[in-house]
Amino acid sequence: MTQMEEAKRGVITEEMKKIAKIEKIDPEKLRRSVAKGHTVIFRNVNHDWVVPVAVGQGVRVKVNANIGTSRDIVNVEEEIEKAKIAVKYGADTIMDLSTGGDLDFIRRKIMKAVNVPVGTVPIYQAAEEMLARGKAIIEMTEDDMWKAVEKHFKDGVDFVTIHAGVTKEVVEKLKRVNRVVGMVSRGGTFLAAWILHWGEENPFYKNYEYLLELAKEYDVVLSLGDGLRPGGLPDAGDELQIAELYTIGRLVKRAREFGVQTMVEGPGHVPIDQIPTHIRLMKIASDNAPVYVLGPIVTDIFPGYDHISAAIGGAIAALNGADFLCYVTPAEHLGLPTIEHVKEGVIATKIAAHAVNLTRFEEDFKIDYQMSLARGKLNWKEQFKIAFDKEKFIEIRKERPTKSEACSMCGDLCAIKIVREMLGHKARS
């Protein structure tokens, strides 16, 4: 039975108990939320060593880090190190988006390297295998697509992005809608091109019940991908995005009836003032399914700094109901990220998630409160102990030292130091 089916029967599973203990929440509330489909639990039945993670209502906003090879750069050890660094700096999950090299080997190595849930996009493997055989992506058969999905499920992948909402009807609209950027989802584009070439319906939509059967067998969470997401600010909220969203909403309902867990993927580029509306619309269309957003990026003119843009958008999205933030690195739109880029991307997105979590969970706020106390006392040892990135803390302190008990920005002109000394002087008087 899936986590959702057990929850509907009134059973609090071992995974729910573990999550409730980690999150310090009521396990019964978690069970009810999972039963409704408002919260999902990542834990493939074949992924024995994973620490289960919950995403959705009543739990903390989570962070995902994408890693993986490309056709240009295949360095498996580097990708494994990226996964470890991502987890070290706060990623709750990893997605392996590899498109170069031995994809089965890479995926399995990454899964063994970390104990967090791992997600994938199986259509990438189906497409890559076509290219490896000297064929065009559109030559892949429905069987090729399903084999990739089943292989990932059997390997223990906890959640997968499936672009079931890229239907033949929506693709027909693509011909007449004048988009500035077009389609930017790789998986969505592979399927759209396949549909246009063969004139057939998306296999994941046409045979959605078969997908549900597979997902149910392994208790894999279906992350219903936004193949028509906006790839630039001018395309945000257009009819293609909204048409796909409502199709996804209907697919969520069918999955719940089947006892399969689902979440909904959200837009990538959205003007900052439109983010609350986008998130609310996603929640309405999906009857409060967990929302998984990439960013969203709030401005398009800062390549090299898109991790900052995404953190701004992610904080606003999470405050308005987004449950799961996919990180963006400084390399976004420019190239394959390095290990350092991964670290920077995770920390930026972790800031966004924590900024929202501390407004909802007393325990999270207490950490910031303790830091405020330490700063008020100029207690550098305690500040170091609490600091999220201790390496950065030490690096800057060593780089710019001071003889005063304050920092080298103010030294003896430190406001905290002056007020403390004055108050201490008056008290002695």
Curated annotation (Swiss-Prot):
Cofactor: [4Fe-4S] cluster
Catalytic activities: 5-amino-1-(5-phospho-beta-D-ribosyl)imidazole + S-adenosyl-L-methionine = 4-amino-2-methyl-5-(phosphooxymethyl)pyrimidine + CO + 5'-deoxyadenosine + formate + L-methionine + 3 H(+)
GO BP annotations listed: thiamine biosynthetic process; thiamine diphosphate biosynthetic process
Gene Ontology MF terms in the entry: 4 iron, 4 sulfur cluster binding; carbon-carbon lyase activity; zinc ion binding
Cofactor note: Binds 1 [4Fe-4S] cluster per subunit. The cluster is coordinated with 3 cysteines and an exchangeable S-adenosyl-L-methionine.
UniProt superkingdom: Archaea
TM stretches of this protein: none
Residues that hold [4Fe-4S] cluster according to the record: C407, C410, C414
Binding site for substrate: N66, M95, Y124, H163, S185, R186, G187, D226, G227, L228, R229, E265, Y292
Gene3D superfamilies: Radical SAM ThiC family, central domain
Biological role stated in the UniProt entry: Catalyzes the synthesis of the hydroxymethylpyrimidine phosphate (HMP-P) moiety of thiamine from aminoimidazole ribotide (AIR) in a radical S-adenosyl-L-methionine (SAM)-dependent reaction.
PANTHER family according to UniProt: PHOSPHOMETHYLPYRIMIDINE SYNTHASE, CHLOROPLASTIC (PTHR30557:SF1), THIAMINE BIOSYNTHESIS PROTEIN THIC (PTHR30557)
Protein name, entry field: Phosphomethylpyrimidine synthase
Biological classification of the source: Archaea, Methanobacteriati, Methanobacteriota, Thermococci, Thermococcales
